[in-house]
Structure formats: C-alpha cells, structure tokens
C-alpha cells in the first residue's frame, strides 16, 4: 500500500512523534511505500518529503494556521497528487497543520485514519483539565459550552490565545471532522469514552493500543532487582513528580528520576540534601533502559489524564512492574497485583503506602515481560492496523 503519515513534527519530541516515526519504520519494513507530512522545524530529521511541508509556525502564522491556510492546502494537495496514497494516517495535526488536510484527503477519495494522542477533538487546550484552587482538575465544560475556553483563558492564561482556540474548535467541529474521517483510533478506552462524552459518534472509534519495537527489548534474564524505584518522563507538576518526591523522601526509599523538564532545577535544589533521591536528567533509550530493567518498579504518578503512556508498556516489556496513578488510561495497562498496582492520583499518603507495598511484593518478572512483549509487539499492532487501512473495521 501507499501510506501517507501526517504529524506536526518529525523528530523525537514527544510520544506522538516517536509513534509516527516508529510506525514509518514498521510500514517500510513490511514493504509499503510511505510518505510523511509535517511542519518545517529546525530539529526535524531529514526527509525526502520536506519540500511539501509548510513553514515553521511563527508570528502571524500562529494566528491563521489553525484554520487551514493556503500554504498547507497547496503543499498537501500537491503531495496527495504526486504520491497518490491509498491511506492518509493522521496523528497530531491541529494548529500547526490543521484538519484541513483530512478534508483534502477525503475530497480526493483517500481513506483517512486518525490516531488520537490527546483530547484536542473535544478540548481546545488538549487535556480536558484546568487549575481550580491551584489544583489541576478534570474539566468537561467545553463539551456543552465552547466559550468556556475563553471564560477560563485555558490556553496559557491568554485571552487572545483562548479566543483562537475557541474559533478553531468552532470551525473544526464534530460534524465536520466525522465527515472527513473514516475511523478514529484512540489508544485507550479512556480516550474513546472522553470523545464520545464530548459528542462524537461511538461507532467512528476503535481502540488500538500503542506498540513497541520488540527488537530494542533485550531477551529477558533472571537477575536480582536493584534497591530502587524509577520515574521516567517529563519533570513537571502535571506528571506528579513533586508528589512522588515527597512520598519517596518520607519513606527513605531510593528513587531515581530520569527526564528533563521545567521543574528539574527546582526539585534538584529542594532535595539536594536527600540521599535517597537522584536526578539523572534527560537520557536516551540505550542509557536509561538498563536502569529501568533493574528497577524494583517504575512509578507513573500522573496528575493529569494520560492517554496510553508508552513508559508503562516499555517498563513492563523489560520485566519491570508499574505503580501508576488511577487516572486517564493508565489503569487499563496495569493488572492489579500482577503487572503492578495503582494509587489515587495526587494523594501522597496513598502513593507512599503503595510504594511500600510494591517494595516488598513478589512479582513474576518473567511473566510480566513475556506477556507485554506479546501483547504490545509491532507484529500484533501491524495486523490490527492493516484491517483499518483496508476498511475492514
């Protein structure tokens, strides 16, 4: 098949980018012809298709791009005509590319498949959350009142930005997006339920969990686990890292924090005198994989509704159980007492109690690894995805 993948960026910026680039490799390995559509950006990897991509979104472009500007329409239409895809597979496209590319593909008779990495279809600020009384809280006001984004200034506290978010949501409404999309693929039941609660038609959605490249997972080896737990991800408030550090410091249990983020300097300073907490900063897979592999467990203390976090899948594939916050799509990935445990998101007391419970719990690490590799392998994912590409959903 000829498959066109679309995503805002084309480098390892976040989960959506990593997914798109891994999918490109998988499809090419299976013998498909693959083209890519993204936005020009200094950190992008090289691509033979970049001549079709729109310019980086700065200045005035940031205001008009979300509504489908001429440069996007021209470039994407030309790519469709030149490449002649059988399927266009969309990922994160709002704002920088805009859903106009879905309409273009649909108008040219191309099947449109859309993987949903966030809640943008029903929430202008992507997360269905906002701060109330200083605490990040689940919010669905926009499901029934699109002006809520303006009233609460949900986009970075900016009135102009929130107005743009409102206008974007009005233009790319449910009816319009359902009309030009053949199937939406949320990676979690949670994301499907969120979109349906926001007014979308359930029959347009099919849950397809993310995958891992099992080639990068070393064969399981029985080895003693280290005397530490690990956090892997962005170091910020919504990821729950401050709450995790409080719990670890209280217990005197060793915690290794891997990742960069806006709160890293602050937390390093705050816990400089705590020998039990170690901050390693940003690391690549080859460097952090052995650390996660030997950890007693990985902690995902999210305080916002994560969709289908890859860190859970990767950790379990390495034979490392996961202690995850009971929020968003995280509980779907954890079998209580078998592949990990869950705790009440944002509750430092419950988190501390579950860290203690996990520390002394006997897990079958081999079974965790074997089951995860089988369940989340690229082969299993590919077989399911091809059915959606062929319209057999």
What does each of the following model-derived ranges do?
Residues 107, 120, 131-184, 193:
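Membrane-proximal helix-turn-helix segments that form the acceptor-binding/catalytic region
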Residues 190, 211:
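Carbohydrate-associated surface elements
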Residues 266-290:
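Nucleotide-activated donor-binding/catalytic signature segment of Leloir-type glycosyltransferases, i.e.
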Residues 336-337, 341-348, 355-362:
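Conserved acidic donor-binding segment of nucleotide-sugar-dependent glycosyltransferases
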């Amino acid at each position: 098949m000829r498959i066109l993948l679309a995503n805002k960026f084309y480098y390892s910026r976040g989960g959506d980018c990593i997914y798109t680039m891994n999918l490109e490799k998988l499809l090419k390995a299976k013998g498909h012809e693959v083209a890519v559509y993204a936005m020009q950006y200094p950190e992008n990897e090289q691509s033979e298709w970049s001549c079709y991509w729109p310019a980086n979104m700065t200045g005035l472009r940031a205001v008009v791009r979300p509504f489908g500007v001429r440069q996007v329409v021209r470039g994407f239409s030309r790519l469709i005509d030149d490449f002649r895809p059988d399927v266009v597979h969309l990922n994160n496209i709002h704002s920088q590319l805009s859903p106009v590319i879905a309409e273009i593909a649909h108008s040219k008779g191309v099947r449109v498949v859309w993987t949903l990495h966030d809640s943008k279809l029903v929430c202008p600020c992507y997360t269905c959350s906002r701060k109330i009384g200083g605490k990040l809280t689940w919010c669905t006001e926009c499901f029934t009142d699109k002006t809520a984004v303006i009233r609460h200034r949900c986009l970075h506290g900016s009135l102009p930005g929130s107005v743009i978010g409102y206008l974007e949501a009005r233009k790319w409404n449910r009816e319009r997006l359902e009309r030009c999309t053949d199937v939406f693929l949320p990676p979690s039941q949670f994301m499907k339920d969120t979109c349906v609660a926001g007014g979308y038609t359930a029959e347009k959605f099919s849950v397809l969990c993310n995958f891992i490249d099992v080639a990068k997972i070393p064969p399981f080896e029985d080895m003693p686990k280290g005397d530490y737990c690990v956090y892997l991800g962005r170091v910020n408030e919504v990821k729950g890292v401050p709450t995790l550090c409080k719990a670890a410091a209280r217990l005197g249990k060793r915690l290794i924090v891997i990742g960069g983020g806006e709160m890293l300097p602050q937390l390093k300073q705050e816990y400089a005198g705590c020998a039990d907490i170690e901050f390693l900063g940003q690391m690549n897979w080859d460097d952090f994989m052995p650390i996660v592999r030997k950890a007693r467990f990985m902690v995902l203390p999210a305080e916002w509704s994560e969709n289908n976090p890859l860190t859970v899948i990767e950790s379990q594939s390495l034979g490392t159980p996961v202690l995850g916050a009971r929020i968003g799509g995280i509980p779907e990935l954890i079998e209580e007492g078998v592949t990990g445990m869950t705790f009440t998101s944002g509750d430092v007391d419950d988190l501390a109690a579950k860290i203690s419970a996990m520390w002394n719990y006997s897990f079958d690490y081999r079974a965790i690894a074997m089951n995860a590799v089988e369940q989340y392998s690229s082969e299993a994912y590919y077989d399911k995805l091809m059915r959606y590409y062929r319209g057999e959903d």
